[in-house]
Amino acid sequence: YNLKSKKTLILFFALAMVASACSSAAVPCDEVEITTGENGLPDLDGCEFTFAVENAYLPFNYIDPADGEGKGWDYDVFNYLAEEMNFTPVFVAAAWDGMIQAVADGQYMIAGDGISITDERDKIVDFSDSYIVLQQRMLVAADNDSISSAADIQNGDFKVATQKGTTNYDLAVSLFGADKVDAYDQFDFAIAAVISGDAAASIVDEVAGLGYMGANKDKVKLVGEGLQTDPLGFAFPDGSPLVAVVNEGLAHMKDNGKLQEINDKFFSPGFTVSYDDIAEVTYDE
């Protein structure tokens, strides 16, 4: 057992460790060979699935300051799919403004955030099957008795707060004109404008409005009929093989009742987390 053999042995172990590290590196899910698992669902062999979330859009996604963990509808659904289809979810915080284009560019394999499926967006990304169909509604301060319909805003001197780059913003502009619409970077900023009186109303997805009201019944309320019907889905890069995989997973969740269970948890007044309760989020440039 001489020095040369010792050096050789050390080199052997070093190379073995490198080889082990390389072999254990997770393969991106859009490159993995998809097989069928024992449960009949696609098996993705432990690959990494990057999921873009804003982490600032209740009830879909947020960071709990108590433990620093990401939580919300997106997290519950995607973590469940990960268990059922053997992949590793990698949640990446991304600003809403530019998220869909980033998916189109291949920066993320999938995006959540309650994305409305539209013909315009479908030109640059592929969508999953819709997991819920919702109404867009008006949200006003709880003590506001001046607004009960879109006509009240159209005929009055009011401002409407929305989030940039959303179908809520597009609908507000089409109904009220751009001069009456103030656009904010995040949804909670728009709601804060309503509560403070800087805006008279906001147009929101009904499920987001119901979730927000769970902890803020004394501050805001939904008024009027639905203004527009929107199906929501996950966004993928155009041509992604993972669309079919996620669609199978969503169908499984619909069949076994898990999707309804998660919807009931987050898309109702029973969801009591407010924007005051969640951690602030910063995004990489």
Q: Residue spans of the language-model regions?
A:
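Short helix-initiation/N-cap motifs at beta->coil->alpha
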Residues: 73, 90-102, 147-148, 182-196, ...
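Extracytoplasmic small-molecule ligand-binding "clamshell" domains
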Residues: 29-114, 123
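C-terminal motif of bacterial Sec signal peptides marking the signal peptidase cleavage site
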Residues: 18-21
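Ligand-binding clefts/hinges and TM-proximal coupling segments of bilobed small-molecule sensing domains
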Residues: 24-39, 167-184, 222, 251-285
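Ligand-binding cleft/hinge of the Venus flytrap
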Residues: 61-65, 78-86, 168-185, 213-217
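A ligand-binding cleft/hinge motif common to bilobed small-molecule-binding domains
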Residues: 98-101, 114-123, 171-174, 195-229, ...
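Flexible hinge/capping segments at coil-to-helix
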Residues: 141-159
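Periplasmic-binding protein-like
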Residues: 55, 133-140, 206-251, 269-285
